[in-house]
Amino acid sequence: MLDIKRIRTDFEAVAEKLATRGVDAAVLNEMKEIDAKRRNILVKVETLKAERNTVSAEIAQAKRNKENTDDKIAAMQNLSAEVKALDAELAEIDAKLTEFTTTLPNIPADSVPVGTDEDDNVEVRRWGTPREFDFEPKAHWDLGEDLGILDWERGGKVTGARFLFYKGLGARLERAIYNFMLDEHGKEGYTEVITPYIVNHDSMFGTGQYPKFKEDTFELSDTNFVLIPTAEVPLTNYYRDEILDGKDLPIYFTAMSPSFRSEAGSAGRDTRGLIRLHQFHKVEMVKFAKPEESYEELEKMTANAENILQKLNLPYRVVALSTGDMGFSTAKTYDLEVWIPAQNNYREISSCSNTEDFQARRAQIRYRDEADGKVKLLHTLNGSGLAVGRTVAAILENYQNEDGSVTIPEALRPYMGGAEVIKP
């Protein structure tokens, strides 16, 4: 959530920044007018309350003097009625301002490339060289079916489209991947957490999914509960409405969880395979940091995600998202895109973001600065470390052999019970 004071005092700069995110200037101008009206009403209310206090004192004095107070009582009643009417108007204005501030996206950092969509993203670096096959590489969905480790047909029968069963070494591979990821993040100082997989609406508001993106979630009917779209939600809300000790920052959390997404805006995209599912496992990283340290922490988090891909020897690239492609809550995002041979393309496998104080303001996560003792909003960061299903897809395709088998990456073999190859 944006700081209304910043919008008020630095309106032109904020409007210019948000315009790069597709926010119409008319929206901000309307917000500015409503805010000005609110401040004018506040002045009127304070003036009327002061007058009312004066009249009240005069009534008390008149009663002590045994004078008639009818006119003064009538005047005070009129003043009270005016205050009540203005308070009601203020409540309506505050609701409108809240609607504005909770639905406007975050202000992009100065280092974010300006653009309208993913075509304007900027590649930062690449790692690894895509493998050259001397045979036609198969898509991971065909490999998974041929190996008998991924079953979309029965997933569709039991549930519906974009669901599947992992079987045998496929299930073992999925488990090996997320255990490996959690172990690697643990080495980097992350505290492993098992979170609830259901959260309440306040938690969804805190991280920015609600109210703007309700259609993308799975709500439990007639309850205050939602299936988590990512472990970012429970991990970030862990400290909602709390004041942390500044000396304890930064704090690192990691968690593996299922993620549930309706993919309401993705009809027709990636209808086959593991790239876009309604339910998938993901290892998440979340950080709580002081504002002056958060961008250094973003670089470290991105490196933590890269470490996984490097140890799995999967070629990838790092991309800085443009203002038009960033998520709602983020001030800056790096995407990690892994090479998918059958698509001859890099596909997103991780997003690492600094939301600055956007989520912290919504969730009221603060810290007491040990230097001056003041309570301040901290910065929150989140990143995929990594999306597990997409990692399975990348391994199947990059490690496939001409006979249809798939070699298991060396880093995962200690987690695979001695298996080195998945064979038909």
Swiss-Prot record:
CDD domains referenced in this protein's UniProt entry, alphabetically: SerRS_core
Keyword annotations: Aminoacyl-tRNA synthetase, ATP-binding, Cytoplasm, Ligase, Nucleotide-binding, Protein biosynthesis
Domain of life per record: Bacteria
Subcellular location: Cytoplasm
Pfam family, one: Seryl_tRNA_N
Annotated ATP binding sites: 261-263, 348-351
Root EC class: ligase
Family, per entry: Belongs to the class-II aminoacyl-tRNA synthetase family. Type-1 seryl-tRNA synthetase subfamily.
Biological role stated in the UniProt entry: Catalyzes the attachment of serine to tRNA(Ser). Is also able to aminoacylate tRNA(Sec) with serine, to form the misacylated tRNA L-seryl-tRNA(Sec), which will be further converted into selenocysteinyl-tRNA(Sec).
Protein name, per record: Serine--tRNA ligase
Gene encoding the protein: serS
